[in-house]
Structures are given as structure tokens and as C-alpha cells.
């Protein structure tokens, strides 16, 4: 497994070293600091059919654990498959495979479906899987919502989550936005059976 992770990371890195494209996001965090996500990627193909490989890193300007990893993805006509490996300091590592399918898009409303499986190895030795899927809706004005269901079989825990986003302001090129976000999730079974989590926030986000 370790050798696969090393080969996977080297493959992604070798792809992006040839005219890689750098980009990312900076977002305000209600708990302090700024969340910074950066990635270097290379796309082969066109907008309708392509293969993308890259490396990424994420962290907060106030400190805390940083995450880094690599990914590969193949897309065609709005459908796609992806594979990602990530490592978070003082937490563990995850290998995630996912698929998404385009269901509807009339240039104003967009609806997509997705499914995923992740395998996480914690630094303390505990390993667990997470499988699930969901639906995501996006409006051309920047509003959106998503519904996700997942299961961790090792804990016999199922989770249902709903999130939403309302765009309050956007720059002319839509690279910077002010969004109101909220979400609610509930656990069924496992150590958090019956627990409901709610969150709401106001965030400034910028793409570079």
C-alpha cells in the first residue's frame, strides 16, 4: 500500500512539472485565520474530455495541521472519475476514489450526483472506510445546496447531511465572493447515534 502511494504521488508530480497550472482559494475562517488551499495541476484534453493530475496543500494562517496530497481525474461531458491521496499532520492519511455524473444543466440550474469511497489510516493505528454519495445543486448566481449520505461500517454509523450556500456579493469576474453558508447533519447508529450538528457562517472567498 505504501509503495502504491509513493508511485501515485510521483506520477501526479511528474504530470504537473510539465507546464503545470497554479491556483487555489483563500477563505475566511470563523474560528480564526484564513484557510488557504493551493494546487498545481496539469490538464490534458479540452473542456469536454480531459485528464487532470496534480498536487495540493491546505492549511490555516493561524497554524494547526496542514494537509497535502496528490490527485488524478478523468472527465468527459460532465461525468468523471477521480483518485486522491492526502496526508494531514498529526492525524493520518486517506485514499479516496470518487465518481460524479452530470444530471442536468440549462446554463442557469445545474444538478450533479456523486459517489465515493475513502480509506483512512489514523496515526494511532485505527483504520476505517467511509462510503457514500449525494446530490449537488448550483445556480448561476452562486447559490447552491448539497445532500450527502455516508456510512462508516467499522463504527456501524450512518450520517445524513444537508448544506446550503447563498451568495451575497461577487466581484465582476466572480473570483471573490461573500457567501452565507449553513448546514445540518445527523448520525444514526454508532458512537454518535442521534447526535445532530448545525453550523452557519459568513465567509469571504477568493480564487487565484
Swiss-Prot record:
Compartmental location: Secreted
Maturation propeptide residues: 21-47
Induction per the UniProt record: By bacterial infection.
Tissue-by-tissue expression: Hemolymph and fat body.
Signal peptide: 1-20
Pfam families documented for this protein: Attacin_C, Attacin_N
Domain of life: Eukaryota
Keywords from the UniProt entry: Antibiotic, Antimicrobial, Immunity, Innate immunity, Secreted, Signal
Keyword Ribosomal protein: no
GO BP terms, alphabetized: antibacterial humoral response; defense response to Gram-negative bacterium; innate immune response
InterPro entries: Attacin_C (IPR005521), Attacin_N (IPR005520)
Record GO cellular component, one term: extracellular region
Positions in coiled-coil regions: none
Role of this protein: Hemolymph antibacterial protein against Gram-negative bacteria.
Family (UniProt): Belongs to the attacin/sarcotoxin-2 family.
Listed name of the protein: Attacin-A
Organism: Glossina morsitans morsitans (Savannah tsetse fly)
The organism's taxonomic lineage, starting at the top: Eukaryota, Metazoa, Ecdysozoa, Arthropoda, Hexapoda
Amino acid at each position: 500500500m505504501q509503495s502504491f502511494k509513493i508511485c501515485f504521488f510521483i506520477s501526479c508530480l511528474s504530470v504537473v512539472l510539465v507546464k503545470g497550472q497554479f491556483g487555489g482559494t483563500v477563505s475566511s475562517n470563523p474560528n480564526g485565520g484564513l484557510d488557504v488551499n493551493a494546487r498545481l495541476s496539469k490538464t490534458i484534453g479540452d473542456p469536454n474530455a480531459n485528464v487532470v493530475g496534480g498536487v495540493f496543500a491546505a492549511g490555516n494562517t493561524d497554524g494547526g495541521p496542514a494537509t497535502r496530497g496528490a490527485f488524478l481525474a478523468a472527465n468527459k461531458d460532465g461525468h468523471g472519475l477521480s483518485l486522491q491521496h492526502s496526508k494531514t499532520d498529526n492525524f493520518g492519511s486517506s485514499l479516496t476514489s470518487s465518481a460524479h455524473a452530470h444530471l442536468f444543466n440549462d446554463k442557469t440550474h445545474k444538478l450533479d450526483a456523486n459517489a465515493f469511497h475513502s480509506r483512512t489510516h489514523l496515526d494511532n493505528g485505527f483504520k476505517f472506510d467511509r462510503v457514500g454519495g449525494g446530490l449537488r445543486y448550483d445556480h448561476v448566481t452562486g447559490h447552491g445546496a448539497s445532500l450527502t449520505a455516508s456510512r462508516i461500517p467499522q463504527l456501524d454509523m450512518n450520517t445524513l447531511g444537508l448544506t446550503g450556500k447563498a451568495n451575497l456579493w461577487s466581484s465582476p469576474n466572480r473570483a471573490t465572493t461573500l457567501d452565507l453558508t449553513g448546514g445540518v447533519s445527523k448520525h444514526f447508529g454508532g458512537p454518535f447515534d442521534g447526535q445532530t450538528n448545525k453550523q452557519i457562517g459568513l465567509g469571504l472567498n477568493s480564487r487565484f
